[in-house]
Amino acid sequence: MRLSSPRINEVVARCRKGEETNVLFLLPPNIELSDFLSPPENYSRIKIRDREFGSVITDIPLGVTSLSGYLKKHFSVDVRAVDFNVVLNCLIDAPADSFEEIFSNAILEKTVGWRPDIIGVSAMFSSAYEGSLDLLRISRQLFNDALIMAGGNLITAMWKEYLDDSPYLDLVCYGEGELPLYELLSSEIATDYLSNSTSWITHDTASKAKDRLKHNFVNDLDELPPVDYDILDLPGYSKNPTVSRFSVPTQSRMDSNERVEALIENSEKLLESIPPIPIMTSRGCPFKCTFCASHAAHGRDMRYFSVQRVRTDLQRLVTKYGCSHVVVQDDHFMGGKRRPYEVVGAMKDLNIGMFFQNALAMYALDREFLRLLKSSNVDELVLPIESGSMRVLRDLMRKPLKTSIIARVVKDCRQIGIYTDANIIVGMPGETRQDIEESRAFLKTVFADWFRIYVATPLPGSEMHQLAIDLDAYVLPPYRAHYKRAVIKTQDLSPDDIEFYTYLMNLELNFVFNSNLRLGLYDVAIKGFELVLSVKNDHPFAYLGIGIAQASMSKFDQANIHFDKAVEIFFASYSYWAPFLDELKIDIENFNAEKFMSWLRGRWALVPSESEEIIESVEVG
């Protein structure tokens, strides 16, 4: 089922000699088939011909686009790509009960009159595991003489599992692929090179690979050619990018004696002919957070593009693609004392909007840098708070962050006029109910605009993953992990407990104790709830939140409409919502708006607050 050694040598020799070589990159969907066909209650959805399916994020991939640029620089290659995250979002007809027909049809459509010599499957997330195995099998069925390889963050960490589970796979790349691909395709006899390579694993070398594998990085990133976005269907990535889940607000400037109001626009309105384009200005991250696996692919030592190279690439995005917004995906953008200022300055000079998807190290976010971001039209930041428990941060996550820094940065952002999305992780190995209660209590005192609460996901390649193996904590296979589905247990918490607390904290922090509601910024709060309803139109807590805001503005008729809608949805799915309502002590059996509002204000009053100071000290631009 795999290629013979002579055929591998033949494919590589043709490329080495400068003959035209066809390369096809395939990206599996970052969603399991079961979650796509039957999305759980708390998943966002897409609709195809009146049937709901699990929502699939369409983020432009940087791995295969960088590899394409590098291959085109050194070899005579024709590169094509099929991203099945885009394919699923562009479906016109509802799919059958498998991905197979979708995969086959999309590949055949992309390869009409063209046959790939090399097929590369790239996977980043655990949820892509089963889909990537399907693509390897289908690729061999369609193109039995192609050299089939696989790589990416997930495959680097799970290379043994891929070789065990896929007899169709010829070789696996370990870590970043630019230099390994160059060395392979330049080798005199490919099979001899592979037998001794520290960057590639085959079925024949797997037994001795563990002891000799090592990264083979391009150390001077300026040597890399520009990322080749041309192999992608760029407009297709406008369908459902991660950035559309964030509010991307603009902040109104007002008198210091007036309350600050924000106008939050759904970022989809910002998506023009192409979506915001991702960039990386560096690779690597020196920190050792136990839940992170990026070092498995990119290492811990920092490598940077020069600021001048970043400027050149940004200008190219503007000139060639009409780019107006970028998504910065560096794992550690804040590396270097002045470099972050210079890179942001380059984007500001070109009037490019920027969104920091992977968040920014909070210790480095002083007021000077935050003001620079605000003056550069950055109106929203993702903050990697991760937990409100000092023990969890220090001992379980090994994250260099103190709760005092969290409070200071969130307060500074609000005063400067930057909307904040706080990332929170629940269910780390060793985390207890007491830790979660401590986190809940602290986070209520932090006036972030929105909290994004995720199930702790043991990414293959992370220390957390290895710890879960050592503790025999896995209840489901690692590849079943999802930011809304727990696959491990802790000594104190079952997977169901972890999922319950994750969603409970979402409901509590974003709706019942919504920061903007408590600060009296009702229009801001309503826009946030409306964004939720645009993703899930039957979310009762979003209707409840709008009702709270309207009642607080004495718009009682409108408030009652939304309260009634919330109660209706609660009762329609009572078995699902009842545990959360009980924990939050919300009585819907005999719901009375006036009594509810009085009770809620009493709950708010119990939380330590600096709301007046926060409001009154907003900076005026």
Residue ranges and their predicted role:
Residues 7-19, 66, 365-377, 440, ...:
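Short amphipathic alpha-helices and their capping/turn segments at secondary-structure boundaries
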Residues 162-180, 370-381, 438-453:
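Structural recognition of alpha->loop->beta junctions
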Residues 2-311, 318-322:
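Acidic, low-complexity intrinsically disordered segments
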Residues 2, 6, 20-35, 44-55, ...:
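C-terminal accessory regions of radical SAM enzymes
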Residues 25, 121, 150, 174, ...:
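Conserved beta-strand positions
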Residues 146, 352-353, 397, 401-405, ...:
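Short acidic, glycine/proline-enriched helix-loop-strand junctions
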Residues 59, 229-421, 426-428, 432-441:
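Radical SAM [4Fe-4S] cluster-binding motif and immediate context
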